[in-house]
């Protein structure tokens, strides 16, 4: 064997030893990289991102549901963080959702990347007891973000001390936990902030101030679905919202959420049978809703509205069998008007035939034997229901009857100042009263009118949208205040079927314009006649000068000039 052949053949043990050495070096290097990577995985920038998320949250009484570790059952801090890591991943991916391409959405994506990188630092040693030591919480988003920030902060501190600390076996600690997850799911998806009653203030988060117990716009959706026949006013035509402090009760906004208890209502009893401010009793709203029809939807579709009933009141006497003084509140838009089938009073008609006969309200939820007495207010002849003098909002309801019409004589200026508007629009009183409707449905018989309607100057396009029968308007003074039949409802939107009465100011303006035009035409005719007469005189003068006699002095002078020698 040559030296070259001996040198080319190396023992197999030599090659194996070198390979093992290379593998050991690679493993040790990877372990060192993992340890260094886990120790500095969470930086101060991630904690700042979480703090910015906390600072950008809106303070709200809305609560969200999520699952997290019950620290009372799991005392070991390492096992607590190890169990919470999986839950934090679920919260970041499913619960923390923001609009795309926003700072909060970008911060959430960075937190998701961080949680994916931390998978190599946490060793999962539990499979069977996945729900152990886990409890369902129902807290505010602010509290949830604070828990997540505390988790990352504590994890950062443990990894800086020992990168392999989360390889600890926590099965024994998880086995000690008892499942006592009895927290129910919230019954709403928190689309808007809910009110926090005084009874729940102790359980609210310390970072949120208690929400007010009245939300003016929270029950808007409920009103749109529950309002009955009344007024289909536009937002610009709605009267100002006025609340009577004696009759208004505080309550949480109407919604499908029933988790919050209603606030306690003070009960004010007044022994005197006058319409004083009393505390509402349960069932008043049911009585009001049951007394109204369901034709409001058709009326809204046809574009009609009963704005003439804005000033009529529904009052309940405190002498009913139920007990206590009843005075319904007017927090809803449909409470500002009565039902549309009742006819309204015009300028030339005043309320008469007012009796003290009680009005029986039948409620399907109550026995029919219970009645509510009406205490109307008699008005004199000077008080009329005009559009520019009536109250745009009354703190009472009006119980209207074809035989009896109640009128409120209290001027608007003496009521309480308006606080809020149901549509969020506050209009001046003058601008509100100046708005008139352009859809006037009156029959030709009404325009001809009787003695009650002659000589009265009616404004153009009254806002009451009268739909009264011709027989009702043909009557004279004897029919004023008498019971009039209910006009048939027309659900089909029509154009103007009757000729509207012109405004006196407009007719006067047209009269003056026509008069000025006639005067100008007369003056122009006179000027044209004088010019024509002068034009006829000028040709006569010219003809007379041409036809002069030959023996005149002028002709002789001309002959003399011609005969002169050159």
UniProtKB/Swiss-Prot annotation:
Protein name (record): Macrophage colony-stimulating factor 1
Signal sequence annotation: 1-32
Compositionally biased intervals (Polar residues): 253-265, 348-360, 400-410
Organism: Rattus norvegicus
Intracellular or extracellular location(s): Cell membrane
Membrane topology: Single-pass type I membrane protein
Stored SUPFAM superfamilies: 4-helical cytokines
GO cellular component entries: CSF1-CSF1R complex; extracellular region; extracellular space; perinuclear region of cytoplasm; plasma membrane
Extracellular-facing ranges: 33-508
Disordered as annotated region, ranges: 197-417, 434-484, 538-566
Alphabetical list of PANTHER family matching this protein: MACROPHAGE COLONY STIMULATING FACTOR, MACROPHAGE COLONY-STIMULATING FACTOR 1
Any matching Pfam family: CSF-1
Subunit structure: Homodimer or heterodimer; disulfide-linked. Likely to exist in multiple forms: homodimer consisting of 2 identical 150-200 kDa proteoglycan subunits, heterodimer consisting of a 150-200 kDa proteoglycan subunit and a truncated 43 kDa subunit, and a homodimer consisting of 2 identical 43 kDa subunits. Interacts with CSF1R.
GO molecular function, one term: cytokine activity
UniProt modification remark: N-glycosylated.
Gene: Csf1
Function according to Swiss-Prot or TrEMBL: Cytokine that plays an essential role in the regulation of survival, proliferation and differentiation of hematopoietic precursor cells, especially mononuclear phagocytes, such as macrophages and monocytes. Promotes the release of pro-inflammatory chemokines, and thereby plays an important role in innate immunity and in inflammatory processes. Plays an important role in the regulation of osteoclast proliferation and differentiation, the regulation of bone resorption, and is required for normal bone development. Required for normal male and female fertility.
Biological-process GO terms, alphabetical: branching involved in mammary gland duct morphogenesis; cell surface receptor protein tyrosine kinase signaling pathway; cellular response to parathyroid hormone stimulus; developmental process involved in reproduction; homeostasis of number of cells within a tissue; inflammatory response; innate immune response; macrophage colony-stimulating factor signaling pathway
Cytoplasmic side stretches: 532-566
Disease tied to this protein: A defect in Csf1 is the cause of the toothless phenotype (tl). Toothless rats display osteoclastopenia, severe osteopetrosis, and dystrophic growth plates.
Phylogenetic placement of the source organism: Eukaryota, Metazoa, Chordata, Craniata, Vertebrata
Keywords assigned by UniProt, alphabetized: Cell membrane, Cytokine, Disulfide bond, Glycoprotein, Growth factor, Immunity, Inflammatory response, Innate immunity, Membrane, Proteoglycan, Secreted, Signal, Transmembrane, Transmembrane helix
Main location: membrane
Glycosylation sites: 106, 153, 171, 302, 353, 355, 357
Amino acid composition bias (Basic and acidic residues), ranges on this chain: 377-394, 434-445, 557-566
Spans through the membrane: 509-531
């Amino acid at each position: 064997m040559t030296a070259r052949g001996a040198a080319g053949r190396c023992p197999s043990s030599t090659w194996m030893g070198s390979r093992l050495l290379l593998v050991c070096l690679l493993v040790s290097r990877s372990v060192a990289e993992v340890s260094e990577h886990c120790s500095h995985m969470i930086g101060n920038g991630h904690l700042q991102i979480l703090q910015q998320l906390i600072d950008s949250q809106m303070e709200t009484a809305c609560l969200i549901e999520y699952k997290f570790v019950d620290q009372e059952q799991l005392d070991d801090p390492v096992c607590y963080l190890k169990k919470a890591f999986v839950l934090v991943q679920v919260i970041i991916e499913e619960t923390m959702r923001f609009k795309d391409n926003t700072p909060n959405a970008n911060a959430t994506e960075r937190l998701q990347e961080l949680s994916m990188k931390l998978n190599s630092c946490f060793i999962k040693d539990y499979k069977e007891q996945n729900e152990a030591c886990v409890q369902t919480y129902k807290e505010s988003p602010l509290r949830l973000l604070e828990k997540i920030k505390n988790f990352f902060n504590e994890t950062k501190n443990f990894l800086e001390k020992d990168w392999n600390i989360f390889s600890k076996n926590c099965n024994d600690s998880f086995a000690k936990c008892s499942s006592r997850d009895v927290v129910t799911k919230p019954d709403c998806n928190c689309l808007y902030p809910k009110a926090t009653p005084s009874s729940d203030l102790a359980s609210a988060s310390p970072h949120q101030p208690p929400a007010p117990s009245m939300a003016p716009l929270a029950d808007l959706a409920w009103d749109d679905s529950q309002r009955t026949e009344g007024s289909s006013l536009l937002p610009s035509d709605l009267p100002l919202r006025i609340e009577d402090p004696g009759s208004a009760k505080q309550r949480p906004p109407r919604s499908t959420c029933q988790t919050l208890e209603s606030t306690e209502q003070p009960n004010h009893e007044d022994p005197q049978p006058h319409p004083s401010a009393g505390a509402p009793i349960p069932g008043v709203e049911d009585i009001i809703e049951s007394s109204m029809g369901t034709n409001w939807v058709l009326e809204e579709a046809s574009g009609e509205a009963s704005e003439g009933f804005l000033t009529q009141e529904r009052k309940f006497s405190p002498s009913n069998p139920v007990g206590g003084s009843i005075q319904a509140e007017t927090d809803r838009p449909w409470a500002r008007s009565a039902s549309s089938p009742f006819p309204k009073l015009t300028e030339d008609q005043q309320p008469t035939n007012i009796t003290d006969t009680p009005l029986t309200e039948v409620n399907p939820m109550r026995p029919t034997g219970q009645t509510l007495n009406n205490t109307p207010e008699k008005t004199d002849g000077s008080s009329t229901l005009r559009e520019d003098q009536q109250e745009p909002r009354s703190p009472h309801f009006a119980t209207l009857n074809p035989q009896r019409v109640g009128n409120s004589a209290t001027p608007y200026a003496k009521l309480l100042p308006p606080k809020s508007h149901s549509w969020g629009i506050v209009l001046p009183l003058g601008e509100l009263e100046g708005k008139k409707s352009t859809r006037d449905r009156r029959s030709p018989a009404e325009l001809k009118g009787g003695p009650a309607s002659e000589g009265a100057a009616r404004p153009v396009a009254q806002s009451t949208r009268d739909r009264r029968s011709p027989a009702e308007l043909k009557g004279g003074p004897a029919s004023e205040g008498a019971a009039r039949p209910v006009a048939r409802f027309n659900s089909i939107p029509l154009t103007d079927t009757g000729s509207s009465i012109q405004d006196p100011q407009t007719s006067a303006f047209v009269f003056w314009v026509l008069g000025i035009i006639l005067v100008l035409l007369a003056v122009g005719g006179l000027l044209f006649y004088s010019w024509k007469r002068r034009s006829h005189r000028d040709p006569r003068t010219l003809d007379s000068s041409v036809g002069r006699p030959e023996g005149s002095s002028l002709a002789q002078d001309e002959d003399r000039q011609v005969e002169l020698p050159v």
